[in-house]
Amino acid sequence: AMIKDELKESFARDIVLLKYLGIHPIIVHGGGPEINQILDILKLPVKFVRGHRVTDDKTMEVVEMVLSGKLNKQIVSLINSKSGNALGISGRDGKLATAEIQKIEVADENGKTELVDVGFVGKITKINKILLQSLLDAKTIPVISPVAEDNNGQALNINADTMAGAIAGALNAEKLILHTE
């Protein structure tokens, strides 16, 4: 996620410019620093395994609150302030993204690997292309938080770059741009 206001403004202007040039941007955002900040305030542990946030039930609540509530709405508002017609959703909305729990492969000092359970961390199994295409056909700029759900309705934390790649692949996108501050 972007922290600096001038970068946020520039990003929003660039996204709206792409739209007016006939390109159909879809935004998938992360929010690691903001999630960490709220976890610290709540005195909940922040732990990663090979770049994946260990996500228990309380952490998943914070992840979804920060990504789908706070940050998604801020990004939508910023793009809309530039006449962008953005619409915020999460991967859970309309079953945009279905996922399954992902275990992370970790090697010990001897090179032996094992699968580690990192909680409610998922890998995408399906993208709802019809929903995405309908949002694009409605001339909106979808702004998507990387929270998906499994077949039982359990919220899963998805790496934003992974979600963006899955969406780009599902839509046969010509370009995938990964942006970070």
Task: Write out the residue ranges for each language-model feature.
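Nucleotide/pyrophosphate-binding catalytic subdomain
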Residues: 1-180
